[in-house]
């Protein structure tokens, strides 16, 4: 019996050593691209259709304010930035290694009604991050397992779920998937301005793509959307600064402003000497005053390049809602591509490591039984 126990102990040591090596693995070099990306040459302006109902304003912010400014600080966060936490103990399906969306990302199969796409299928990557079936923030689907949103949308260990597949929040037909895990950028902060406002949401089980549900493309790190490019932001946020959130998904067309110019505009408005829009941010502006508002946070800012829709930004913050001359600020997705790949790869490694720990525990249990 001692001899048999020794064999099991040797196997246990071998598995532990293997787990340690795999736990240190970071599969970034071998991780495939998230999606085929548009080249920087030959970018054509999107032939998008006219907006249906304009959004106004931006999410709340904790930035310093001029006297009389109606912008209110965001609610305090209740999580540790940079850490992943489980919101539900779910294991309905085995977690796969990271598999990027197919080359079909960034395309939509909208029905044409009156010469333009119907809302139900116009933005198939748009999701609603919800708690107890109440809309909290927007987000966008980047693969069958993952959603991308803003870090300031995460309030702690709540029972989050993701709503997708319909433009109507009251619809009884949508897909609603519980959230298994959320990864917040480790350097997210709202101390002086909002920085690194990005988070990844892991679904409890993979979504099935359909005409109503499709992933959006994520740009390469080197991709920079040019100033003046026409893009679209979507969400279920407020349609007026002092109004209510919308039941139907809204959209508005914006012109891109690079972070350097946007920073100067906002500094001039606020009389502030601090850098408000840092590298990793990008801005959008509509001359008529429409943009995103409270409730739109975390949602996508997308642009069409070569007939493919690419997410260039995540709704982050702004001053008030729909004010003429006030651009809205977005997290620039291309700047965080390496972080996205790293975290998705790390999640895959962690799951594999967890499987090995379970295997070791089972082997140890068998060794004890044999010894007895």
Curated annotation (Swiss-Prot):
Q: Which BP terms in the Gene Ontology apply to this protein? A: proteolysis
Which CDD domains does the record match to this protein? Tryp_SPc (cd00190)
**Glycan-carrying positions:** 208
UniProtKB keywords? Cytoplasm, Disulfide bond, Glycoprotein, Hydrolase, Membrane, Protease, Serine protease, Signal, Transmembrane, Transmembrane helix
* GO cellular component annotations of the record: cytoplasm; membrane
Record-level Gene Ontology MF annotations: serine-type endopeptidase activity
The record's disulfide annotation reads 137-153, 231-303, 262-283, 293-321
Which residue ranges traverse the bilayer? 352-372
Bilayer topology? Single-pass membrane protein
Could you tell me what this protein does? Answer: Lacks protease activity in vitro.
Annotated protein name in UniProt: Serine protease 44
Q: Native species of this protein?
A: Mus musculus
Q: Lineage from the top down?
A: Eukaryota, Metazoa, Chordata, Craniata, Vertebrata
């Amino acid at each position: 019996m001692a001899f048999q126990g020794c064999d099991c102990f040797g196997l246990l040591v071998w598995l532990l050593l293997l787990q340690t090596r795999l736990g240190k693995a970071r599969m970034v070099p071998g991780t495939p691209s998230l999606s085929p990306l548009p080249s920087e040459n030959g970018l054509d302006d999107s032939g998008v259709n006219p907006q249906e109902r304009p959004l106004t304003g931006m999410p709340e912010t904790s930035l310093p304010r001029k006297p009389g400014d109606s912008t209110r600080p965001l609610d305090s966060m209740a999580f540790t930035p940079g850490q992943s936490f489980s919101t539900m103990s779910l294991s309905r399906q085995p977690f796969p290694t990271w598999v990027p969306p197919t080359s079909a990302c960034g395309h939509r199969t909208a029905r044409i009604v009156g010469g333009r796409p119907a809302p139900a299928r116009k933005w198939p990557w748009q999701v609603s991050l919800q708690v107890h079936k109440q809309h909290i923030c927007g987000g966008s689907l980047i693969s069958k397992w993952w959603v991308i949103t803003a870090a300031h949308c995460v309030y702690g260990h709540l029972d989050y779920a993701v709503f997708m597949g319909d433009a109507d929040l009251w619809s009884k037909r949508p897909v609603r998937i519980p959230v298994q895990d959320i990864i917040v950028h480790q350097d997210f902060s709202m101390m002086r301005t909002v920085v690194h406002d990005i988070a990844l949401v892991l679904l409890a089980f993979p979504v099935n793509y359909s005409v109503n549900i499709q992933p959006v493309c994520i740009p390469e790190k080197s991709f920079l959307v040019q100033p003046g490019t026409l893009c679209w932001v979507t969400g279920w946020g407020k349609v007026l600064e002092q109004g209510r959130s919308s039941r139907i998904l809204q959209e508005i067309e914006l012109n891109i402003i690079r972070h350097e110019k946007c920073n100067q505009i906002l500094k001039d408005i606020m009389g502030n000497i601090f850098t408000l829009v840092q590298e990793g941010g990008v801005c959008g502006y509509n001359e008529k005053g429409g943009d995103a508002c409270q409730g739109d946070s975390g949602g996508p800012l997308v642009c069409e390049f070569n007939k493919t829709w690419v997410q260039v930004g995540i709704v982050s913050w702004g001053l008030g809602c729909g004010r003429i001359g006030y651009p809205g600020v977005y997290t620039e997705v291309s700047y965080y591509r390496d972080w996205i790949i790293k975290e998705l790869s790390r999640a895959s490694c962690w799951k594999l490591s967890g499987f090995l720990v379970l295997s070791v525990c089972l082997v140890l249990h068998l060794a004890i039984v044999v010894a007895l």
